């Protein structure tokens, strides 16, 4: 049976939403859950039925948000270190809503990078007007990048879209300040030249194209990706607040909202971060899902489904195979340019 490790510590709202999310997921999927965290804090929220389905690893130590990510390397009794150790030694996936930097650092050091991957990347799903979301990476793991890193992100995003999301022939776009080949900073221009070696490359895309579904995968450095992600979250939250205020403003607005309830439900589902679960860390040798610090039970539940899909689709193996077969084409392309 698939074994999934869940870090209980460090989330904004404590252990309760995480435990509730695990409980809901176990009602719908068959997997073995290992909870790592403070047993004294967790036990009051774990029913007898749930206790019979999960394994509890006790520790009170965890990496606080204000602490440096490097602390995780020293703190071998912290929840994320213990969880990563369990993952390394036989578990199939790990989910954490705690310190994302600590999770990324330990995943890279303890699990190792897939051969050929220079930098792992955070991959996140973005809402789209189409029937399926867009994939964005890097969403914050690497703020300073070289073109070679973005090539890695493109390959990993392509494989994730194809293997886990089952997108047929996904197209990859490079985020820029214009669609034309000449647009972008030096990083974008150099990456664009290298990505031309791949059939899946669509070309440059603008920020608005992310939500239009112009391409399936959008590649950028982690600084830009995180700005896009946080801006999107802020806009979605602001629009939601505006809607609520306007609906409450008059009886006519309330009646109109009732008539549009189904449409609002669909809109919420498409724009609610919780429905997307978490963000996979691609490029390490096991499946790691980084959840939002403010994750509610639904977000944790969906993150578990995400982890199950990643393991079942063997995404780490698919990325390994992609780097063996596809990445050499970049070197060949660069050699051709030099010869020319």
UniProtKB/Swiss-Prot annotation:
Instruction: Quote one Gene Ontology molecular function term.
Output: phosphate:acyl-[acyl carrier protein] acyltransferase activity
What reaction gets catalysed by this protein?
Answer: a fatty acyl-[ACP] + phosphate = an acyl phosphate + holo-[ACP]
Record note on quaternary structure = Homodimer. Probably interacts with PlsY.
Any one of the GO CC terms: cytoplasm
What broad class describes the main subcellular location of this protein?
Answer: cytoplasm
**Protein name, please?**
Phosphate acyltransferase
Gene name of the encoded protein: plsX
Location of this chain's protein in the cell? Cytoplasm
Q: Where in the sequence is the signal peptide annotated? A: none
Pathway(s) per entry: Lipid metabolism; phospholipid metabolism
Q: What EC number(s) is this enzyme filed under? A: 2.3.1.274
């Amino acid at each position: 049976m698939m074994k999934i490790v869940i870090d209980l510590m460090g989330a904004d709202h404590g252990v309760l939403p995480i435990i509730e999310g695990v409980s809901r997921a176990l009602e719908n999927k068959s997997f073995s859950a290992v909870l790592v965290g403070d047993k004294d804090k967790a036990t009051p929220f774990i029913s007898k039925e749930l206790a019979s389905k999960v394994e509890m690893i006790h520790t009170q130590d965890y990496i606080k948000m204000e602490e440096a990510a490097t602390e995780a390397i020293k703190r071998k009794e912290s929840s994320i270190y213990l969880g990563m150790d369990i993952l390394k030694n036989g578990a199939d996936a790990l989910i954490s809503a705690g310190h994302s930097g600590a999770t990324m650092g330990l995943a890279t050091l303890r699990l190792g990078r897939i051969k050929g991957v220079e930098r792992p990347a955070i991959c996140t799903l973005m809402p789209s007007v189409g029937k399926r979301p867009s994939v964005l990476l890097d969403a914050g793991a690497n703020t300073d990048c070289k073109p070679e890193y973005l090539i890695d992100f493109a390959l990993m995003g392509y494989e994730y879209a194809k293997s886990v999301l089952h997108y047929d022939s996904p197209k990859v776009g490079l985020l820029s300040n214009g669609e034309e080949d000449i647009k972008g900073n030096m990083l974008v221009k150099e990456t664009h030249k290298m990505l031309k070696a791949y059939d899946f490359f669509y070309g440059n895309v603008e920020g608005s194209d992310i939500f239009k579904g112009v391409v399936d995968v959008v590649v950028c450095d982690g600084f830009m990706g995180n700005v896009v992600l946080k801006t999107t979250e802020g806009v979605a939250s602001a629009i939601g607040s505006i809607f609520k205020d306007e609906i409450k403003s008059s009886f006519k607005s309330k009646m109109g909202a009732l008539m549009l309830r189904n449409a609002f439900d669909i809109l919420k589902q498409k724009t609610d971060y919780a429905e997307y679960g978490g963000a996979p860390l691609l490029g390490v040798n096991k499946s790691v899902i980084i959840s939002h610090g403010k994750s509610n039970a639904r977000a944790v539940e969906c993150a578990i489904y995400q982890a199950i899909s990643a393991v079942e689709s063997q995404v780490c193996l698919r990325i390994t195979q992609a780097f063996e077969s596809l990445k050499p084409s970049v070197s060949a392309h660069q050699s051709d340019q030099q010869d020319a």
